[in-house]
Design a protein with these regions (language model features):
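Glycan-recognition and catalytic cores of secretory/periplasmic carbohydrate-active enzymes
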Residues: 1-389
Length: 389
């Protein structure tokens, strides 16, 4: 077991330091305006200069996280600083909320009803504070987190997804705030961070439906099952990501039994829904009644559900010592590494057909860039090393 974990730890580290980070520093980092481009073709050539604001925060987080966990590479720290500077200069609207897309030089293009741009910027600032030792960034992260809570709590501040006819709440914001709060808590203490995690953990109970053995993406305000195509959606990768966020929090609390058990249940159920017995890999969407999902990418294999499953299975093994989770880790890791990496041009493909063939070869766009893959490598390296101590 020790040799298995050490081998994977080294593979994750080498892939991060020799492939993923160099690819994005070479092809993504904007050395003129600051920040990072993510819309790049298979070979890294730029196909659109539009900048994803999500990825300004995500990349600054990853570069800082790699610096803090893998090696003190000054290029990573400088890249994180450049991207945070770009965020502060260009990515905030006058109301304190953030944009979704900006031009190469930072002029606003789109703003959306989410607070994901803010969440990613907050974890970037927190991680950069730890990397640089400049605690003003920890304070900025905490302020932004409090702003996020205010935006969510203020009626009319964020446009609702549905009109009043449908009262619903979504899984995404509940789970992302666990991770956002826990990353900030690493560098600065505030009661609001633990309060948010407690609230999110409680709220997640509403999305768990034992009758379907599933965590759903959308429910009514009090957890009511919404029997529509959208209400029946299971996003296995998303649920698996939530499971590891919960396991990370359980570990923080000395392996809290209740949180651990809930997280493992979500992981086990979501693996059953997501793992493709015929072709391997985690598929995109299922319907909890086994009806046809609406999303046309429903049976595709995207990059990020695989990376989240790699992290979650390692956490589950750490929590339980049950070797079934190592077997799941082996399955998902081997399948992922057999299908996603591009051995010719570097980095990973993002979008595969169900059978594992490449659907389109670009290495990045507004939604795919240096986040899930490098975060998986850093986190999994860390977990493998802990497990071999």
């Amino acid at each position: 077991m020790k040799s298995y974990l050490n081998e994977w730890a080294e593979r994750y580290r080498a892939d991060l330091t020799e492939n993923i980070m160099p690819f994005w520093l070479r092809h993504g980092l904007d050395r003129v305006n600051g920040g990072i481009y993510t819309c790049v073709d298979r070979d890294g050539s730029l196909i659109d200069t539009t900048k994803s604001v999500w990825f300004q925060g995500r990349f600054a987080f990853v570069a800082s996280f790699a610096y803090n966990t893998i090696e003190k590479n000054p290029e990573w720290l400088a890249a994180a600083k450049s991207t945070i500077d770009f965020i502060e200069a260009h990515c905030f609207d006058t109301d304190g909320r953030m944009y979704f897309e900006v031009t190469a030089d930072g002029r606003p293009l789109r703003k959306r009803r989410y607070v994901f741009s803010e969440s990613f910027a907050a974890i970037a600032m927190a991680e950069y504070a730890k990397a640089s030792g400049d605690m003003t960034y920890a304070e900025k992260a905490l302020k932004l987190f409090k702003d996020i809570r205010r935006f969510i709590a203020t009626p009319g501040c964020l446009e609702p997804k549905y009109l009043d006819t449908l009262q619903a709440k979504g899984h995404s914001i509940v789970m992302i705030l666990i991770n956002t709060a826990s990353r900030i808590r690493e560098v600065i203490a505030d009661p609001v961070l633990d309060q948010q995690i407690d609230e999110s953990l409680e709220s997640l109970k509403d999305f768990v439906k034992p009758e379907f053995k599933a965590l759903l993406e959308m429910v009514g305000p009090n957890g009511e099952f919404i029997d529509t195509i959208n209400g029946r959606v299971i996003n296995p990768g998303h649920c698996i990501e939530t499971a590891w966020f919960m396991l990370e929090e359980a570990k923080h609390r000395g392996w809290d039994k209740e949180i651990t058990e809930r997280a493992l249940q979500i992981l086990d159920w979501s693996w059953q829904w997501g793992w493709d017995e015929q072709y391997g890999g985690i598929i995109n969407f299922r319907d909890c009644r086994n009806l046809p999902p609406q999303d046309y990418s429903q049976d595709m294999k995207f990059w990020w559900p695989q990376t989240e499953a790699i992290i979650a299975t390692l956490y589950a093994y750490e929590a339980t010592g049950d070797e079934k989770y190592i077997e799941m880790h082996r399955q998902i890791s081997e399948w992922t590494y057999a299908h996603f990496p591009d051995t010719e041009y570097g980095e990973w493909y993002g979008y595969l057909h169900r059978d594992g063939t490449v659907a389109q070869p670009a290495k990045g766009n507004i939604f795919k860039g240096p986040f899930h893959i490098p975060r998986m490598m850093i986190k999994s390296y860390e977990l493998c090393k802990e497990l071999t101590k």
